[in-house]
């Protein structure tokens, strides 16, 4: 015979790892070509000048320059403008 009763099982106790989403470069920071600017799920921020969107909606720089976040038509855009 068991000296203690059987312990109950739980269906909880799991969690996924955080995905580290959000801004990786902020307004005014210098971005090299290919640098990740914003990691996201869906299009919270849209690509602007010299910025492209990858398959997982990550925004990255196409040219060297300074990052600029802009609001246009109720959307947030991020652009990279070359240094003058």
Curated annotation (Swiss-Prot):
Keywords: Ribonucleoprotein, Ribosomal protein. The keyword Ribosomal protein applies. Disulfide bonds: none annotated. One of its GO terms (biological process) is translation. InterPro entries: Ribosomal_bL27, Ribosomal_bL27_CS. GO terms for molecular function: structural constituent of ribosome. Gene3D superfamilies: 2.40.50.100. Belongs to the bacterial ribosomal protein bL27 family. This is Large ribosomal subunit protein bL27. It comes from Mycoplasmopsis synoviae (strain 53).
């Amino acid at each position: 015979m068991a000296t203690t009763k059987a312990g109950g099982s739980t269906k909880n106790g799991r969690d996924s790892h955080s995905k580290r989403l959000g801004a990786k470069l902020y307004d005014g920071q210098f971005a090299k070509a290919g640098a990740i600017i914003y990691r996201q799920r869906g299009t919270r921020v849209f690509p602007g000048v010299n910025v492209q969107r990858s398959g997982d909606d990550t925004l990255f720089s196409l040219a060297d320059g300074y990052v600029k976040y802009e609001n246009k038509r109720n959307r947030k855009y991020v652009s990279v403008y070359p240094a003058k």
